[in-house]
Every structure is written in structure tokens, then in C-alpha cells.
Design a protein with these regions (language model features):
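Short, polar/charged alpha-helical segment
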Residues: 32-53, 386, 404
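Short, well-ordered beta-strand elements
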Residues: 22-32, 51-57, 81-82, 126, ...
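Glycine-centered hinge/linker elements that transmit conformational signals in sensory
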Residues: 162, 209-240, 285
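Short, solvent-exposed loop/beta-turn-alpha elements that line the ligand-binding surface or hinge
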Residues: 101-113, 179-188, 201-222, 271-275, ...
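Extracytoplasmic "Venus flytrap"/periplasmic binding protein-like
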Residues: 25, 44-114, 118-120, 142-153, ...
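Extracytoplasmic/periplasmic solute-binding protein
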Residues: 126-130, 135, 159-212, 256
């Protein structure tokens, strides 16, 4: 692999024409094994280029990350050269990042066009896709087999199966087990979860592609009320403060029958220290009724170069290295992160290491985007208003119908004459 990585770096350096050893800093989140994987790659990159890469560790919460990024970029901070960015941030931060279109012209056709499009703003490629994301339903196949249950296809089936297995396992001395864990803290992750409940129930996607505010409807309200009914019955009350890692912690210790989470949790769940190693599988998220289409929120992480960086050439070389086929292959095998390069879904090594991954391709290809493209720079506010309304509902502060009605008023005011 070292030879392949070296080739990727050499190609990137040739394109950028960097002639001196640079010191660059990359901001990246601490979810799962991301930081450990990056540190290994930095060693190889430094060896091949002579550059020095420092890691600026960010919290796993994308909401906290975005807030810090905005502060740095608004101040014209040159300390951070490369930013790991969420798929939804491109429209909001585009003006702060370098256009990578020319630098990536030799490889851009290898990526999924829809993912490249998500990072293109006004014709400028503001970030290179590092890995894509779409959540799925993790389930304990051993427990479903034990009780003769099928993988649930609807949310109602999920609740019933989760409750039955949870209760029977508790009777059999598994006192700490819960039926279903997910992410219900008041942050961007709750927007993702709630969008899935609503969209899969025919309730729209908060703000439609044409800019119409659609969230205040009966199907959306019913979806939220259904989720509210899980709290304290099949989901622990503490789920209201769970983000991805808290949900994974409960799941990986063997204390949940089902979990909604992103692909990164797959390899960790099969780690040597996992209580559920070899005992689980994944399936598409449930729907409201048979015949409805599963709705996984489109996620993914990208790499952007700051326009305030004093080492843009070296920063671009690092971005091309970290998004290369060889690195994405390693990330898929080691971290179970979904590649953004089309050809890797036919790679036999990836299929052998992560048998689920080829089957995940249609999940993310049909994934539902959050309304960041249509709401543009106002998306962060749209999302925070939405997740607040959802969290209030789940917490018992007002009904879903009441909270969505108030949300519609707030979003209409926020939109003004246009998004």
C-alpha cells in the first residue's frame, strides 16, 4: 500500500508544484477511529513530501464543529489550512474556501457526480469528498433469531419487536438492555433522525427543493409523536442527550436490540473489545407503511482548503492525498467508511473486509439530502429551529402539532422574501 500511497502523493505534489517543506494544520473531528487513522496517514504524507501536518482536534458534534469553524473563518484565521467539513456546510462556507476545481480536474470524474455536486457552489468545487455517509438500522441478528423475529420493515414493527425482545431479555437477567437507541440530543444529529422519520412517513423534508416550507403537516406530526412514544418504553430516557457515540456505547456493550447509526459503527462493533462482535447486521431504516421508500439522511465528510491559508499548495496536496483511491480503500477497510469513488464498490478487498458495504451503495444513492442547498446560508438556523421543535416534542414540551405550527411561523419569518 505504501507504494500506492506514495504515487498518490507524488501526483498531488506534481500538480501543486510545492517547492518547500510546509507546516500545515488540519481540523478534524474525533468520531470513532477518525483521528487515529489520520495520524497514520500524516506520517506517510510527511515522509513522502517533507511537509509537517498538525492535527487540530474537534469534538464529534458537527454542531460544535461548525460553530468553531465559523469563528475561525470569520476572523480570517490562517492557523488552520485544511478543514474536515460536513456535506451540508458547502453553501454556507463556500466563500471562505479555495476553489479546487482545477486541482482536482484529473480525478473529479472518478467520484459520484451527486457528491461532487453537493460540494460545488456557483461552479466552484469548495471541498473534495473524503467519505460519504447514510445511516442504517443495526440489529442483533442473534436476538432476532433467538425469538424468531424478522428484521422490521416499518417503524411500528420496530417498536413491537424491540419491546418484545427487550422485555424477554430483561426477564432472562439482561436488566440493562433497551430495544432501540438513536440520537435525540438537541443538535444536527437530531435533524437527521427526525428527517428520516418524517420523510419515510410521507411528511416531506422540512423545506422542499423549491423552497416551500412543508414541515407543518399531519404526517410529520404523527411521525414525531410516534418517536416520542419510544422514550422510556423501548428507548432509555437518556437518549434525549445521546449523540452518535453515546448510542454506539450502549449498543456495543450489548445493551440494545436495535440502533440507528452511521457506517463507522460497523467496524467498531466488530472490534475485539465489542460485546456484539459477529452478532449483528444492518438493514435499511424502516418506513411508515409497507410500500413506502426508506429514507436515510445523506451525510458525508469532505476536505476544504482555507482561503486564508499561507500554504495552499501543500494543503491541496494533502487534500488530494487523503481523498485518493488508495487512502479511501484503506479507510473503507479499517474504518468502514463509505468511499466517494465509484470504482471502490467493486473492489474485492473492500467486499471481503466489509461484506455489508457493496449493499450500502443503494442506501446512500437514494439518501435524502437535508435542505442546505435551498436554504443556503440560513440552513444552520433552519436546522437548529427544527431540532429544537423536535426535541421539545420528544421531551414532552408541547405536542408535535403545536411545535410544528410554531416552527412553520419561525421558518417563514426566517425565510423572508426568499431563501
Amino acid at each position: 500500500m505504501k507504494k500506492l500511497l506514495s504515487a498518490a502523493v507524488v501526483a498531488a505534489m506534481a500538480l501543486c508544484g510545492s517547492a518547500h517543506a510546509a507546516e500545515i494544520t488540519m481540523a478534524a473531528n474525533s468520531t470513532g477511529k477518525n483521528l487515529d487513522f489520520l495520524r497514520k496517514l500524516f506520517v506517510e504524507f510527511e515522509k513522502q513530501t517533507g511537509h509537517k501536518v498538525t492535527l487540530a482536534t474537534m469534538p464529534p458534534s458537527s454542531t460544535e464543529q461548525f460553530a468553531q469553524y465559523r469563528l475561525w473563518l470569520a476572523a480570517g484565521n490562517s492557523d488552520i489550512d485544511v478543514y474536515q467539513t460536513d456535506v451540508i456546510w458547502a453553501p454556507q462556507l463556500a466563500d471562505q474556501f479555495v476553489d479546487l476545481k482545477e486541482a482536482a480536474s484529473d480525478v473529479v470524474d472518478q467520484f459520484f457526480p451527486s457528491i461532487i455536486a453537493s460540494q460545488t457552489v456557483d461552479g466552484r468545487l469548495v471541498a473534495m469528498p473524503m467519505f460519504t455517509d447514510a445511516p442504517a438500522l443495526y440489529y442483533r441478528k442473534d436476538l432476532l433469531e433467538k425469538y424468531g423475529k424478522a428484521v422490521p420493515k416499518t417503524w411500528q414493527e420496530l417498536a413491537a419487536t424491540a419491546k418484545e425482545i427487550q422485555d424477554k431479555e430483561r426477564e432472562a437477567s439482561q436488566k440493562d438492555i433497551w430495544g432501540f437507541v438513536f440520537q435525540a440530543n438537541a443538535y444536527e444529529g437530531l435533524t437527521c433522525n427526525a428527517l428520516e422519520w418524517i420523510k419515510s412517513s410521507g411528511g416531506g423534508q422540512i423545506v422542499e427543493p423549491d423552497g416551500t416550507i412543508s414541515v407543518n403537516n399531519e404526517k410529520a406530526a404523527a411521525a414525531l409523536e410516534q418517536a416520542k412514544s419510544w422514550i422510556g418504553t423501548i428507548s432509555p430516557p437518556g437518549v434525549l442527550s445521546y449523540q452518535e457515540e453515546e448510542a454506539r456505547g450502549v449498543w456495543q456493550t450489548g445493551n440494545a436490540v436495535f440502533m440507528r447509526n452511521w457506517p463507522y459503527a460497523y467496524s467498531l462493533g466488530n472490534g475485539a473489545d465489542s460485546a456484539v462482535k459477529g452478532k449483528f447486521d444492518v438493514a435499511p431504516l424502516p418506513v411508515a407503511a409497507a410500500g413506502d421508500k426508506p429514507s436515510s439522511t445523506l451525510g458525508g465528510w469532505n476536505l476544504a482548503v482555507s482561503r486564508y491559508s499561507d500554504e495552499q499548495e501543500a494543503a491541496i496536496a494533502l487534500v488530494k492525498f487523503l481523498t485518493s483511491a488508495e487512502v479511501q480503500k484503506g479507510r473503507a477497510i479499517e474504518n468502514s467508511n463509505l468511499p466517494t469513488l465509484q470504482a471502490l464498490y467493486d473492489d474485492p478487498d473492500i467486499a471481503a473486509a466489509q461484506p455489508f458495504m457493496p449493499n450500502w451503495k443503494p442506501i446512500f444513492q437514494d439518501a435524502v439530502p437535508r435542505p442546505s442547498a435551498v436554504t443556503k446560508v440560513k440552513y444552520n438556523e433552519v436546522s437548529s429551529r427544527f431540532w429544537s421543535a423536535v426535541h421539545n416534542t420528544l421531551s414532552g414540551s408541547g405536542t408535535a402539532a403545536e411545535n410544528l405550527e410554531l416552527l412553520e411561523v419561525e421558518l417563514t419569518e426566517l425565510m423572508g422574501s426568499s431563501w
